[in-house]
Amino acid sequence: MNIYRTHLCDQLRKEHINQEVTLSGWIYRKRDHGKIIFVDLRDHYGITQLVFNEADNQNFQLITHLRLESVITVKGIVVARDSSTINTAVSTGFIEVVVKHVIIEGEADPLPLNITSTQDYPEEIRLKYRFLDLRRDKVKNNIILRSKIISELRKSMEAMGFIEIQTPILTSSSPEGARDYLVPSRIHHGKFYALPQAPQLFKQILMVSGFDKYFQIAPCFRDEDARSDRSPGEFYQLDIEMSFVSQEDVFNVIEPVLLNVFSKFSNKTIDKEFPRISYHDAMLHYGSDKPDLRNPLIIQDVTEIFRDSQFNIFNSNIKQGMVVRAIPAPNTATNPRSFFDNKIEFAKTLGAQGLGYITFNDDFSAKGPIAKFLDEERLNRIKSICNLQPGDSVFFVSETEDKATELAGEVRTLLGKELNLIEKDTFRFCWIIDFPYFKYDKKEKSINFFHNPFSMPQGGLEALNNQNPLDILAYQYDIVCNGIEISSGAIRNHKLDIMYKAFSIAGYTKEMVDQKFNSLTRAFKFGAPPHGGIAPGIDRMVMLLADATNIREVICFPLNQSGEDLLMSAPSEIDKEHLKLLSLSITKKS
């Protein structure tokens, strides 16, 4: 028999009346009614109301002086509540326990934060006292939700014949794009392990090893700055790799997995379509490769409409190689001047020269600072391409292509929010496909990989030999949900001749590739199957399903914005003897 409890704090019902029970938990609330003190006892599962009577002086005095969140074990008799005190909001609301004996298991100091409060305490307090923060319902429920989601993901993968395999945590430095966390070797002086940014090479080698379908709930470590949707330090992903698959095969595997999880753990409407949007179209029409499809606004390129027009500012920009992008604003033609001025000021804060705009009256006649410079034919083309209606307005950005893309995307997002256009209680997924294989680094004045160097170029070796590298597309893909990238993946480059050629375009010799990726090139010499994979982010999925605004709300022990663990006081200094053992010394920053 368990000496601490006969029942959990959510289990007692009317049928337990007159039974003696033992309960353990935390003092959640106390209500002093003079000769009676009511205590809400909380454990992981629920709450039971305890009754302490003044007649039982010893127990009464003890509970009087105990602080909230102290841990106690009680023995008592289950009784029916008075009809006036029945609480249907809790499962045990028809009964209470009259306490006959109490043991203090752990006394609490004064609390730095109130467990019962929904107050938004400073992050410094919450993370330093995370063990208290995790007792709060909202945070606790997020962690429970995370556990259930991971369990469901495992079930889905196993049902499809995937094998869960753990890959090493100590490995070599990788080229994923972020900075590595390095671990010095005690035995091999001057050498370092790296914590994996992703199990990329290992999972590809597993395919070469003959495993057909692999997955794991993989920890990934990247020395990156924090964002609302990115936790510094570490994150977890559902890492997947499959042999003998095309891009479409990967899509067909992961779509039902995501739909199952999102439908099971949310009451929101889920659009079951996963539209395919090319990277080019995403940047053009949404101003982002992470488009939020709940926002119906579509950006259009109107450069040719303004070319050789009487509006000299845009016309001059176009002659210098700039572009013009249009962002519609439905039902805003009668908005006050301040509405338009605010958008112009917003664009300027982002580095824009400004914004142009045209408003269309109910008779579809055009007004605004630009309208008088455009003939009827050009105005009609704008109406048509932007799908405008009487009473609408349209904003214009004219900048270099990259800058115009960024600005138009920001204006689109702002308008979607201000005009209340973003769908509520909906999840909208999409695939972003056809990423560029290479990019031009203006700073280094060289060609480099756009994203994943291990992906297969569309067109294979022939494309690498004959096409402009900047025109080559990759078999790379992202899944985006409500403007948040939750997964990226690729069909891998499994042929050494294609790999060597691709890396040579990015400035790597064959010898450099063999040295940097020795394990992979060595494996590929012994029969590598076509393979591909994807890796949805667990943290971001939970964040979406929990309706959290910050990813740290769904991580049990997160680092703060500065990459510090306030609970464990990490990172910390290491004593000189330990440094000496690792052949390390600390140089002061100048």
Curated annotation (Swiss-Prot):
Intracellular or extracellular location(s): Cytoplasm
InterPro entries from the UniProt entry: Aa-tRNA-synt_II (IPR004364), aa-tRNA-synth_II (IPR006195), aa-tRNA-synth_II/BPL/LPL (IPR045864), Asp-tRNA-ligase_1 (IPR004524), Asp-tRNA-ligase_1_N (IPR047089), Asp/Asn-tRNA-synth_IIb (IPR002312), AspRS_core (IPR047090), GAD-like_sf (IPR004115)
Binding site for L-aspartate: E176, R222, H451, R492
Catalytic activity: tRNA(Asx) + L-aspartate + ATP = L-aspartyl-tRNA(Asx) + AMP + diphosphate
An annotated GO BP: aspartyl-tRNA aminoacylation
Residue numbers marked as site, Important for tRNA non-discrimination: H33
Protein name as it appears in the record: Aspartate--tRNA(Asp/Asn) ligase
EC nos: 6.1.1.23
Subunit structure: Homodimer.
HAMAP family: Asp_tRNA_synth_type1
SUPFAM superfamilies linked to this entry: Class II aaRS and biotin synthetases, GAD domain-like, Nucleic acid-binding proteins
Gene Ontology CC, one term: cytoplasm
